[in-house]
């Protein structure tokens, strides 16, 4: 199994990099992890809606270039479905049993995701209505992926 995480923008915070590296290492015994950062677009301070759409479209093109044609794609979006960890774990297992070898997770930039990327997605999930920095969401997501594997293993990690 392959887990691909496509994100917009470069992660700069060392504490987040360290956490992501730790969980990636833990996941490695279950799946190959690929972390892909695509460049973000600079957003003018008082950008119009049209400018924001153009920015998301450019970022969306970069994301689309990294999605494999046979990937199962899960986007993180505020309007996505909220899942308990156990359900998320079961979904990951079901995806694999359905014949997909790569699950691709996508976290957009500060403006969100281009509509074309959302339409390409097989599933949209949300971690709640709170607004969190997209850099922090990388760590939260990778921890939940690790937790999903631990649930599948019946590990006491998830209590």
UniProtKB/Swiss-Prot annotation:
Sorted alphabetically, which Gene3D superfamilies does this protein's record hold? 3.40.1280.10
Q: Where located?
A: Cytoplasm
Chief location: cytoplasm
Function summary: Specifically methylates the pseudouridine at position 1915 (m3Psi1915) in 23S rRNA.
Mind telling me which GO cellular component terms the entry cites?
cytoplasm
Subunit text: Homodimer.
**Family annotation (PANTHER family):** METHYLTRANSFERASE, RIBOSOMAL RNA LARGE SUBUNIT METHYLTRANSFERASE H
Write down the Pfam families for this protein, in alphabetical order: SPOUT_MTase (PF02590)
Which residues are noted in the entry as S-adenosyl-L-methionine-binding?
76, 108, 127-132
Q: Name one GO molecular function term.
A: rRNA (pseudouridine-N3-)-methyltransferase activity
The EC code for this enzyme is: 2.1.1.177
Matching InterPro entries, A to Z? Alpha/beta_knot_MTases, RlmH-like, tRNA_m1G_MTases_N
Q: What family is reported?
A: Belongs to the RNA methyltransferase RlmH family.
Give the UniProt keywords, A-Z. Cytoplasm, Methyltransferase, rRNA processing, S-adenosyl-L-methionine, Transferase
Q: Which SUPFAM superfamilies match?
A: alpha/beta knot (SSF75217)
Catalytic activity, as annotated: pseudouridine(1915) in 23S rRNA + S-adenosyl-L-methionine = N(3)-methylpseudouridine(1915) in 23S rRNA + S-adenosyl-L-homocysteine + H(+)
Record protein name field: Ribosomal RNA large subunit methyltransferase H
Q: Does the keyword Cytoplasm apply?
A: yes
**Stored NCBIfam families:** PRK00103.1-3 (NF000985), tRNA_RlmH_YbeA (TIGR00246)
């Amino acid at each position: 199994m392959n887990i691909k995480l496509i994100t917009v923008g470069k992660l700069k915070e060392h504490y987040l990099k360290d956490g992501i590296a730790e969980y990636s290492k833990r996941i490695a015994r279950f799946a190959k992890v690929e972390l892909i950062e695509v460049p973000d677009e600079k957003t003018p301070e008082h950008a119009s809606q049209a400018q924001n759409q153009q920015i998301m479209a450019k970022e969306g093109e970069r994301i689309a270039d990294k999605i494999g044609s046979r990937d199962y794609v899960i986007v993180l979006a505020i309007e996505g479905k909220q899942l308990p960890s156990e359900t998320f774990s079961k979904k990951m297992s079901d995806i694999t049993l359905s014949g997909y070898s790569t699950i691709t997770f996508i976290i957009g930039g500060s403006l969100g995701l281009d509509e074309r990327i959302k339409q390409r997605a097989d599933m949209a999930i949300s971690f709640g209505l709170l607004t969190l920095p997209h850099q922090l969401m990388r760590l939260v997501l990778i921890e939940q992926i690790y937790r999903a594997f631990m649930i599948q293993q019946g590990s006491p990690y998830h209590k």
